[in-house]
Amino acid sequence: LGLAALTRREARGTLLRHIMISFTNISGAEEIGANCYLLEMDGTRIVLDSGMHPKKEGKAAMPDFDSLEPNSVEAVFLSHSHLDHLGTLPVLQEKQPAAEVFMTPAAAALSEVMLHNSVNVMSAKRLDLGIVEYPFFTHNDLDRLSDAWHAKSCNEVFRVGFRQNVLATFYDAGHILGSAGVMLEGESGHTVFYTGDVQFEDQSMIPGADFPESGVDTLVMECTRGGFQRSAHYSRPEEMVRFGKAIEETLERGGAVLI
């Protein structure tokens, strides 16, 4: 997406506000990968997610952290604990030690497990594939850095930034346990809502997203399958039956099933 600068004047009551927002994709763009975005609003620099590309190895799997000035990021928001949104968070923290990191309590618990497992996987790849950059961080690094995470519940309003000038609120995204979109409101009153990955339908164990239905000035939304029309005959129960049959057929012919 590159750098998108939005400047506008708008009347709120009797006050005339000047709004400056910039949004920069530092994740590689145009594919599912190392999700990471820089949002600058009212002078506050915020990073949304810090993922690792699932199909690349070594430094090529990381976002472009070199585009961030050292120690310039004030807050980091994690939408959920899948590695394409989480996998390089400790690297970002080392490069941006002044940044506070925010996520939901469930995301914090899952992220710790996911990242410790990632250390094991990267260490094995270093030995098996000779990828000398791995691991990006160690178990000890993770234990130290995770102490700086702040767990915030959905619908809890809190302030972020060096000047505490941005209001933040998580909303349940329905994607996985602990997933959340985040509403950010600058001192100008302009709001930005970042969805992260979202699922609006109820799943077997996770209810669908509970997002705000108003009050959003700028929306940043995932659209992984946004270009595809869902069949008019689609239903979740029927898809579950199809999925079960596919598993059964695979096992009957001696195949393996990884979920």
Regions found by a protein language model. Give the residues of each.
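Short, Lys/Arg-enriched N-terminal segments with co-localized hydrophobic residues
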Residues: 3-19
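His/Asp/Glu-rich metal-coordinating catalytic cores
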Residues: 21-77, 82, 86, 91-259
